[in-house]
Amino acid sequence: MNDFEKEIKFKSCLFFTISRLFRVVNKFAEESFADIDICPTHGYLMILLDEKREGLSVNEISENLTIAASTVTRFVDKLIEKGYVEREKQGKKSFTRITDVGIEKMPDVYIAWRKIYDKFETAITDSDYLKETTASMKKFTERLENKIDKEIKKD
């Protein structure tokens, strides 16, 4: 394989492309959340808890955010330290709820999320293309997740 073929193969690699995209998206997100004292993923968790004010279990949060339960616990611990969420025991179960302080913080969280979208719109300039790409990427991700879920169930 000559250098040109190697370069073409490298540039068309799905893993490399997705990794590059993640770095760009993550940079947009971190810049957008720089003014508030939480990271983007914590912001997404707060949005989830704001929508489900009755509280959610670690497993419910894990399923919604598609992250490991141990990661959820770490995120919740950080948000508890800041006073934005609290854990409440109900019998053997534990639920995480957004606090009044967290609810007061939500306008800042939504503004930060809007900034991320605005950065995409500014960079891409075609909102229809942005919506189509988002829908396509969501579908792509769901297909991969379904494939992985089926393989796990086989084992």
Show which residues each predicted segment covers:
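N-terminal leader segment of winged-helix/HTH proteins
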Residues: 1-36, 82, 97, 131
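Short amphipathic alpha-helical segments with heptad-repeat character
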Residues: 15, 19, 23, 66, ...
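Charged, amphipathic alpha-helical coiled-coil/dimerization segments
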Residues: 77-135
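C-terminal regulatory/oligomerization modules of transcriptional regulators
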Residues: 1-6, 111, 115, 122, ...
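N-terminal helix-turn-helix DNA-binding core of bacterial DNA-binding proteins
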Residues: 23, 27-68
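N-terminal positioning helix adjacent to the helix-turn-helix/winged-helix DNA-binding module
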Residues: 10, 14, 41-42, 94, ...
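A structural signal for well-ordered alpha-helices, especially hydrophobic packing surfaces
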Residues: 22, 53, 106, 141-148
